[in-house]
Amino acid sequence: MTNRIDQELSFSQTALNLRAYRQELLASNIANADTPNYKARDIDFKSALNGALGKSQGGALALKQTSERHLPAPGGNRFGAAVQYRSEQQSSVDGNSVSMDVERAAFAENAIQMEAMLTFINGHFKTLNSAMQP
C-alpha cells in the first residue's frame, strides 16, 4: 500500500518539478523579449516526463550529478528535460526569437496544467485522509 502511494507521489512530484522548470524557462523567455540575439527556450514536457521516469526510448543518456552544486550539463538538462530552442516564427531585426503571443499562451497553459496537477494531488490526499478516518 505504501509503495503504491509513494509511486503516485513520486510521479506527481516529478511532473510538478518539470512544470515548474518549464515555467522558469517561459518566464525567462518573456523577460528577455527585448534582448538582442536571445533565442526562446522550452522543453517537450511529454518526452521530459518520460525521460525523468526512465521511460525514454533510446537517445543519449544524461550525465549523473552526485551533488546539486555541480555545474549542469551543456544545454541545461535538468530533471531529465533537454532544453530546446524554439524556431523563429517571424524573423526579427535584432535576432531575437521570442514571440510574446506564443510565450504568454505557453505560460498560461503551463500554469493551468500545474494548477490541475495540484488540484489532483489535493484530491488524492483528501481521499487518503477520509479513508484513514475511523
Residue ranges with predicted function:
Residues 1-134:
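Amphipathic alpha-helical polymerization modules
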